[in-house]
């Protein structure tokens, strides 16, 4: 065995701890356990964490502005996709973006190349008129409202109701027909026309699917 100093006994350690001196001029202390170290770390205040989490009012205002800008940019891009699809894929003309204070988002309206919707009761009036006139009644296209949506969005009934409450049955520039007892079928292009919107649902790959939505109940079409 190598020669060296004799290790201190437990009694010597206790004596050295009491008088403040250590063996060979050094204070001998028992090692601190892992649990004690964790308790000491928990007792220390974590100033760095609190500083990183807390935000000044100016920073919060900036984050709010950025969030609003992102939402506006999303709506602009969504509207642009639908307008492009209507004009280039479905040959719509007179396509306009409609912005209104009480609308939750911009709407689109335009003129399709052919008429897209005929009310079931209007269909009956047209058949009667064709029998009386002994000729076909022309079905000219009408201006239609379009609401751009993304497939991932979740809209409630109240959201759609707010849109219907904010619009008129005919988009701006639509020709309204006055009441005429001799041409009841024409009233469906004016006073009898209900509010309807073409939902333009955009998917992630820019594919657009269209659905009709009516304000109120509409009975099924008769074949």
From Swiss-Prot:
Gene3D superfamilies: 3.40.1350.10. One of its GO terms (molecular function) is nucleic acid binding. The keyword Transmembrane does not apply. The keyword Nucleotidyltransferase does not apply. Keywords: tRNA processing. Residues 1-55 are annotated as: Disordered. Signal peptide: none annotated. Residues 30-55 have a biased composition (Low complexity). GO terms for biological process: tRNA-type intron splice site recognition and cleavage. One of its GO terms (cellular component) is tRNA-intron endonuclease complex. Non-catalytic subunit of the tRNA-splicing endonuclease complex, a complex responsible for identification and cleavage of the splice sites in pre-tRNA. It cleaves pre-tRNA at the 5' and 3' splice sites to release the intron. The products are an intron and two tRNA half-molecules bearing 2',3' cyclic phosphate and 5'-OH termini. There are no conserved sequences at the splice sites, but the intron is invariably located at the same site in the gene, placing the splice sites an invariant distance from the constant structural features of the tRNA body. tRNA splicing endonuclease is a heterotetramer composed of tsp-2/sen2, tsp-1/sen15, tsp-4/sen34 and tsp-5/sen54. Interacts directly with tsp-4/sen34. Belongs to the SEN15 family. This is Probable tRNA-splicing endonuclease subunit tsp-1. It comes from Neurospora crassa (strain ATCC 24698 / 74-OR23-1A / CBS 708.71 / DSM 1257 / FGSC 987).
